[in-house]
């Protein structure tokens, strides 16, 4: 099935960034976070509440929609971990 539509306010990039805490823990993750939120917004604008507005578009499928919403939950954790690892590694040289 198609995941719940976050609502016209919920798909806004600024709302997404706030919800994910973009850059709050780690400024280096801000760029990745912003890019993700913009992509997510475009996805929802294109695909709508149930993918119907993107007829024939391969991007509007439930698997991708679920992946987008799942990614928003895991993205920042992963980014922060990666950044921390890079900083740690860079400091060793």
Curated annotation (Swiss-Prot):
Q: Which UniProt keywords apply?
A: Cytolysis, Disulfide bond, Hemolysis, Secreted, Toxin
The answer, when asked if Secreted is one of the entry's keywords, is yes
List the source organism: Parborlasia corrugatus (Antarctic nemertean worm)
Give an example GO molecular function. toxin activity
> What is this protein's name?
Parbolysin P2
Q: Name one GO biological process term.
A: killing of cells of another organism
What are its GO cellular component terms? extracellular region
Source domain of life: Eukaryota
Summed up, the tissue specificity of this protein is: Localized within the skin and proboscis and are most readily isolated from body mucus secretions.
Q: Which cysteines are joined by disulfide bonds?
A: 16-37, 22-33
The role this protein plays is: Cytolysin that shows hemolytic activity (on bovine erythrocytes, HC(50)=5.75 mg/ml). This hemolytic activity is completely inhibited by small unilamelar vesicles composed of PC/PG, PC/PI and PC/PS in 1:1 molar ratios (with at least 100 mg/ml concentration).
> Which compartment or compartments is the protein found in?
Secreted
The record's family statement is: Belongs to the worm cytolysin family.
């Amino acid at each position: 099935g198609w995941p719940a539509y976050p609502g016209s306010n919920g798909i806004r990039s600024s709302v997404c960034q706030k919800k994910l805490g973009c850059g709050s823990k780690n400024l280096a993750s801000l760029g990745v976070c912003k890019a993700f939120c913009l992509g997510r917004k475009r996805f929802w604008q294109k695909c709508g509440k149930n993918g119907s507005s993107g007829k024939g578009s391969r991007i509007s499928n439930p698997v991708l929609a679920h992946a987008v919403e799942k990614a928003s939950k895991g993205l920042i954790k992963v980014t922060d971990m990666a950044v921390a690892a890079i900083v740690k590694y860079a400091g060793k040289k």
